[in-house]
Each structure stands twice: as structure tokens, then as C-alpha cells.
UniProtKB/Swiss-Prot annotation:
InterPro entries: F-box-assoc_dom_typ3, F-box-assoc_interact_dom, F-box-like_dom_sf, F-box_dom. PANTHER family: BNAA05G37150D PROTEIN-RELATED, F-BOX ASSOCIATED UBIQUITINATION EFFECTOR FAMILY PROTEIN-RELATED. This is Putative F-box protein At1g70970. Coiled coil: none annotated. Signal peptide: none annotated.
């Protein structure tokens, strides 16, 4: 009897180990065909194991805004009615989001493990967070939803209470140690006199297996500020560029997802971040990139090489270091097409994506190997006219929201 029980446990462990390496589409099928497998896959222990394994095979995520030409996907029909409070203007073209991802380090590049999800159009402006922990946060004015592009599962979140004239900015953070997501929302009610402007900071906590959640006000002990860049979450800390409302100085704000504490990170005097700056991961560290440095009108080196500088945050020394990067034969290989630096892969390859403001029917990504000096070009495989494309590294598969 004991041997039979031991053998059963061994078989279950083996099944769990095998399933933890399978693609999401296979697990979604297993959930349907077997109650036993569904119980394993939806268990918290397996979800955590699968997320850890997924981090070893990260994805490149493309967030494409384009004209909607197809009916909404069945899994996302609810989002259209969830956000749409006004009817579309007759004759107005509707814009949808397409989330397209591929394995960023697996050969053959850009054709391994393709996933796509189309989010239907709505009349209000929709903003999309940086992917973290396999999820993205969709915001349409005061409405929010979490979405898992890999499983095509979504969850509507409570509306935030804000003044009708408030400017609302949101970020998505994730704490790996506690397995908790938090949506950070900053609202500002604008007034001509700075002293009369009202700033509020609120957080929504989302835990696995917990259905109810609500917005809670928190205190920012640092200076009141207005966000100026997109956010990036790393190691349980959310970073975003901002400007102090008191002296208008640029700074970087960090938000500890677990403790919910803000910290203002001062910048060197020569570093003036604005809307054109973006956060990336450079060889494992947080870095700031000025996207205007990649304007094709900026003259490259006389030999045709591309030289640009980024500011890397040294976590140990707690300081910013200006880093010079040179790409040989850039003009010869790239010409006058706009490409922007998006960070490095786990294999330390530099990734450049076409400027989303000037994308055409075809959209390409460059990989530069710092050891072999090879510069390779890949097409993302999304056809049709695009309004904009946002490229994010290190997206992962996750079983959240299943």
C-alpha cells in the first residue's frame, strides 16, 4: 500500500515537472480535458513554479495600436462595453490594441512561440502599462482592467474615485516575494495657481485567489510630482521619471511595491529627463535612454558608426553613471530608419526597435551582439498599417487570472 502511494506521488511530481515546461496553449487545453490537471495547473504552487520557469524563457512584447478591421475576440468582447461610455462618432475609424509576443532569445528568432491578443476599440483614451509578471494593466480614464495576453484572461478592477477634471496616471507593479500586484494611481486636479493644485496617491492591491479589492489612499512623504515617463518595475520596485511641482526639477521616483513607500532619486545636473526619455534594463541594471538621440537627423560618426550615451543606475554605489555605446557600421546597415534602444537580453545582446512614431507596414527589430559585433534585423510579422508600436523586453508567460 505504501509503495502504491509513493509511486502515485512520484508520478504526480513527474507530471508537474513536465507541465511546468509546456507552453501556455497546452496548459489551457489540459485544464479543459482533465479536472485533475486543472486542479494542479490552477494551484498556487504550480503557478509560482511556472512563473519561475517562464522567467528563463522571456518574451519580446509588441503593443501595436492600429485600425480595427476585425470583430473583437470572444474573450475580450466584455472590455468594449466595459470602457465604452460614449458612442463612436459615425464614420470615425476605431483603433484597437494588438499584443504580439515572441520568445526573445530562442532560435529561430521571432517565430518561436508566437502569441497574439486583440483588445477591442473604445471611444476613450486607453493607456497600457509595462508588462510585469505576465500581466498588463489597461486604463481608460477611471476604469481599469488586468489582462493576461498569453491566456487571454482578463479581470475588471474597481473604478477609481477622482475629480472629473483630474489628470490620472497609473503604473503596474509586482512584488515577487509576496506574489502581489499593485496598481499605483496618481491624480492631479489642475489649477492655475500651483498652491491650489490637489495631488492624490492611491493603490489597488491584487492577490491571487482573492476576488475583492479596493482603492486605498496612501501618503507620499516625498515632494508632490507629476510623472513624465512610462514606468518600469524591477525587483519589487517601480521606477518612473517625474518633475517636482515645487521647483520643477526632474527626478526619478521609486515606489516599493511591498512597503508602498516613495523615494525620490536625484539626478545629475546634466541629466534633464522629459517625455522623450525611457527606462530600460541594461545588463541587469536600470538605465535611462534619451530617445531623441536616435533621430536620423543626428549625424553619426564620420566612419558611419552609431554612438549614443545612456545613464545607468549603479545600485551598489547609489549613483548614475554615463555609459558610452558604439555600434559599428550602423549607417551602412541601418541607413536613415529610426531605431531606438530598448535594452539588453539575458545574453547581453542590445535590442533596437523602430521608432513607433514613424512605423510603416513593416516593423523591424535589431539585435546587436557585443561579442561578435553582428547586427541582425528581424521582422515582427504583424501586417497592416500601424499607428504606433511599443516594444517591451522580458515579458513572461503566467497563469495569473486563470
Amino acid at each position: 500500500m505504501e509503495n502504491s502511494s509513493s509511486e502515485t506521488l512520484h508520478v504526480e511530481d513527474l507530471q508537474t515537472e513536465i507541465m511546468s515546461w509546456l507552453p501556455l496553449k497546452s496548459l489551457l487545453r489540459f485544464v479543459i480535458v482533465s479536472k485533475k490537471w486543472a486542479s494542479i495547473i490552477r494551484g498556487e504552487q504550480f503557478k509560482a513554479l511556472y512563473l519561475r520557469r517562464s522567467m528563463t524563457r522571456p518574451r519580446l512584447m509588441f503593443m501595436v495600436r492600429r485600425i480595427a478591421t476585425l470583430p473583437p475576440e470572444p474573450e475580450m468582447v466584455w472590455f468594449q462595453s466595459f470602457c465604452k461610455e460614449e458612442r463612436c462618432i459615425p464614420g470615425q475609424l476605431e483603433v484597437e490594441f494588438l499584443f504580439h509576443s515572441v520568445y526573445q532569445e530562442k532560435i529561430p528568432y521571432f517565430s518561436s512561440g508566437q502569441q497574439q491578443l486583440r483588445v477591442p476599440p473604445n471611444t476613450n483614451y486607453t493607456s497600457v502599462s509595462q508588462p510585469i509578471g505576465g500581466l498588463i494593466c489597461l486604463q481608460s480614464e477611471t476604469k481599469f482592467a488586468l489582462c493576461n495576453p498569453g491566456t487571454k484572461k482578463s479581470r475588471a478592477l474597481p473604478d477609481i474615485q477622482a475629480h472629473e477634471k483630474a489628470f490620472i496616471t497609473s503604473f503596474l507593479g509586482y512584488d515577487e516575494a509576496t506574489n502581489v500586484f499593485k496598481v499605483l494611481c496618481l491624480t492631479m486636479v489642475w489649477a492655475h495657481e500651483p498652491s491650489k493644485r490637489v495631488y492624490e496617491y492611491q493603490v489597488l492591491t491584487v492577490e491571487s485567489g482573492v476576488e475583492s479589492c479596493s482603492w486605498r489612499g496612501i501618503t507620499c512623504k516625498e515632494k508632490d510630482h507629476t510623472p513624465e515617463t512610462q514606468g518600469l518595475c524591477k525587483g519589487g520596485v517601480l521606477y518612473y521619471g517625474a518633475r517636482s511641482t515645487s521647483d520643477h526639477r526632474p527626478l526619478v521616483m521609486s515606489f516599493n511595491v511591498r512597503s508602498q513607500e516613495f523615494t525620490a532619486i536625484e539626478l545629475p545636473d546634466q541629466l534633464h529627463i522629459s517625455y522623450f526619455w525611457n527606462f530600460v534594463i541594461y545588463n541587469g541594471d536600470i538605465a535611462l535612454v534619451n530617445e531623441s538621440d536616435f533621430d536620423p537627423r543626428v549625424v553619426n560618426e564620420p566612419n558611419g558608426n552609431k554612438v549614443f550615451h545612456i545613464w545607468v543606475r549603479d545600485a551598489t554605489a547609489q549613483e548614475w553613471q554615463r555609459t558610452r555605446i558604439e555600434i559599428p557600421r550602423w549607417e551602412q546597415n541601418v541607413g536613415h530608419v529610426d531605431y531606438v534602444f530598448r535594452g539588453t537580453t539575458g545574453t547581453k545582446e542590445l535590442v533596437f526597435a523602430q521608432d513607433s512614431r514613424h512605423c510603416e507596414d513593416d516593423f523591424f527589430v535589431l539585435y546587436y551582439d557585443t561579442f561578435t559585433k553582428d547586427l541582425r534585423r528581424f521582422q515582427i510579422g504583424v501586417t497592416g498599417p500601424k499607428i504606433s508600436v511599443r516594444t517591451c523586453l522580458d515579458h513572461v508567460d503566467s497563469l495569473w487570472l486563470m
